[in-house]
Curated annotation (Swiss-Prot):
Its cofactor is [2Fe-2S] cluster; Mg(2+). The keyword Metal-binding applies. The lineage of its organism: Bacteria, Pseudomonadati, Pseudomonadota, Gammaproteobacteria, Vibrionales. InterPro entries: Dihydro-acid_dehy_C, DihydroxyA_deHydtase, DiOHA_6PGluconate_deHydtase_CS, ILV_EDD_C, ILV_EDD_N, IlvD/EDD_N. This is Dihydroxy-acid dehydratase. GO terms for cellular component: cytosol. Its EC number is 4.2.1.9.
């Protein structure tokens, strides 16, 4: 029978000092012996996805204490990728994931907490906490802050839906008037919550449902809706049950590695492919699997991308649907239900509710259940009122979107495409693979060939695009922006946005060893591995070299003879794999990150071999 970890600090005469300090935090005499549960919050006023989380920790804590636990809250950092984007701040985004994972480990292990409730929301916070959860392997439940409502504005006598990416594109488009750009900017992000499309934050929060680590609705219920409060309340109650199951009943099925096992990671990736999620999710799933010592790699993702169809199309891949529409169509449980009916789901995986996924779908898939409360839950909709407050409205759609032929979520037979929304490409320019979000690629661009125009940084690429150096038909190559070379693997949303604003969005391809925002669409290929700084072939590309992209064949090729590549490699080995004439200040903290960073095909995690004796 496992012993409560917290007993290390609460039992025995030699722990008198620790107990004295616990008492100073409010622990009462009869509390000693109860499980100590860490409430891992990420409230910050810097990030709209987290600005409403201030009171959420105490809401969860209250339920933990009612259920017989001791709740102790702490906060992690949280970087807003949108605000950090387009300048040196983006260098810090991906490295913050490792800091978050480490800080959770530090706090939980230093104080011997027995379990965790992770209150996350945005891009690197959910992955960082997930890495920590898989690393620590103590009972955990995730509950996120929820998606933002889609923005709305009236243009040309039509009401249109908006999101952050619309504001960015219009702001860079020289044909858009200042007045129209400002109108869109003011309407794009109306409420608290994670940005309203299927960007990285919402993709990751959806994946926690598929992994079994969060409750149904976690990924899709709006941040502003009153129904979301119940997810926090239930998380507080449920974590105490999970904790007691493990420590008092020796039930290891309550542990995250036994819930989010390999089969669950396959489910999460299947969901990601089916919903056309952010390509960043590949990084984070690979990293989390490694933390959980689960054998799951790019080969698995490649295999799944060939057989899982694209069942749900959401902004930025279409302006028609946002997260509020996904929820109306039944949310993650509805997509998983369609995958299950198509024979593409491992339905015997476990969940934090103590059910198998099959049992959970029977209760929560709107195409199966007749439970009126569940159906009402998925009719929760937006209010259209600007606010930074959680649970501030109780609006409902008149009816659910259960149209599986032409609606937001579709059956396999009526899929947006029979191949999924993400694909792994490989070839001599990326021998360990690269990622493209096929959900955002127009059909005429699935095959593309053109001459390279090479930039040594995102900054120079932006300058080149806006300065008219990039021409239709070219492949824009941005290198030395990988985990090590950046360092920090910046998102390339501005280059892709500016290509669109310059009328080149469908006329050019973009290849990088950096990554893309979940808001990116178009023929944008990232995560080229190995990265340039690690000797990847992307570092050998010259202006004018022909690059051939064939998504149906999953290939990407630099059309240069091998003998020429070998000669270039020998020369580059002498020069060192560094960008030419790039002016960038790199702090000691970022240099420390770069010194251990692996390429994207490994999840951009730290190279553990450098620590092994």
């Amino acid at each position: 029978m496992p012993t409560y970890r917290s007993a290390t600090t609460t039992h025995g005469r030699n722990m008198a000092g620790a107990r004295a300090l616990w008492r100073a935090t409010g622990v009462k005499e009869d509390d000693f012996g109860k499980p100590i549960i860490a409430v891992v919050n990420s409230f910050t006023q810097f990030v709209p996805g987290h600005v409403h989380l201030k009171d959420m920790g105490q809401l969860v804590a209250g339920e933990i204490e009612k259920a017989g636990g001791i709740a102790k809250e702490f906060n992690t950092i949280a970087v807003d990728d949108g605000i950090a984007m387009g300048h040196g701040g983006m260098l810090y985004s991906l490295p913050s994931r490792e800091l978050i994972a480490d800080s959770v480990e530090y706090m939980v292990n230093a104080h011997c907490a027995d379990a965790m409730v992770c209150i996350s929301n945005c891009d690197k916070i959910t992955p960082g906490m997930m890495m920590a959860a898989m690393r620590l392997n103590i009972p955990v439940i995730f509950v996120s802050g929820g998606p933002m409502e889609a923005g709305k504005t009236k243009l040309s006598d039509q009401i249109i839906k908006l999101d952050l990416v619309d504001a960015m594109i219009q702001g860079a488009d020289p044909t858009v008037s200042d007045a129209q750009s400002e109108q869109i900017e003011r309407s794009a992000c109306p409420t608290c919550g994670s940005c309203s499309g299927m960007f990285t934050a919402n993709s990751m929060n959806c994946l926690t449902e598929a992994l079994g680590l969060s409750q149904p609705g976690n990924g899709s219920m709006l941040a502003t809706h009153a129904d979301r409060e119940q997810l926090f309340i239930n998380a507080g109650k449920r974590i105490v049950e999970l904790t007691k199951r493990y420590y008092e009943q020796d039930d290891e099925s309550a542990l995250p590695r036994n819930i989010a096992d390999r089969a669950a990671f396959e489910n999460a990736m299947a969901l990601d492919i089916a919903m056309g999620g952010s390509s960043n999710t590949v990084l984070h799933l690979l990293a989390s699997a490694q933390e959980g010592e689960i054998d799951f790699d790019m080969g698995d993702i490649d295999e799944m991308s060939r057989r899982v169809p694209h069942l749900c199309k959401v902004a930025p891949s279409t302006p028609k649907y946002h997260m509020e529409d996904v929820h109306r169509a039944g949310g993650v449980m509805a997509i998983l239900g369609e995958l299950d009916r198509a024979g593409l789901l491992n339905n015997q995986t476990k969940t934090v509710l103590g059910l198998t996924m099959q049992e959970q779908l029977a209760q929560y898939d709107i195409m199966q259940t007749e439970d009126e409360e569940i159906l009402k839950f998925f009719r929760a909709g937006p209010a259209g009122i600007r606010t930074t407050k959680a649970f501030s409205q109780d609006c409902r759609w008149d009816r659910l979107d259960d149209d599986r032929k032409e609606g937001c979520i579709r059956t396999k037979e009526n899929a947006f495409s029979q191949e999924g929304g993400l694909a792994v490409l490989s070839g001599n320019i990326a021998v360990d693979g690269c990622i493209v979000k096929t959900a955002g690629v127009d059909e005429e661009n699935l095959k593309f060939q053109g001459p390279a125009i090479v930039f040594e940084s995102q900054d120079s690429a932006v300058e080149g695009i806006l300065g008219g150096k990039v021409k239709a038909g070219e492949v824009v190559v941005i290198r030395y922006e990988g985990p090590k070379g950046g360092p920090g693997m910046q998102e390339m949303l501005y280059p892709t946005t500016y290509l669109k604003s310059m009328g080149l969005g469908k006329a050019c391809a973009l290849l990088t060893d950096g990554r893309f925002s979940g808001g990116t669409s178009g023929l944008s290929i990232g995560h080229a591995s190995p990265e340039a700084a690690s000797g990847g072939t992307i570092g050998l590309v010259n202006d004018g070299d022909i690059i051939t992209i064939d998504i149906p064949s999953r290939s990407i090729t630099l059309d240069v003879p091998e003998s020429e590549l070998q000669a270039r490699r020998a020369k580059q080995d002498e020069l060192g794999w560094k960008p030419v004439n790039r002016q960038r200040e790199v702090s000691f903290a970022l240099k420390a990150y770069a010194s251990m960073a692996t390429s994207a095909d490994k999840g951009a995690v730290r190279d553990k071999s450098k620590l092994e004796g």
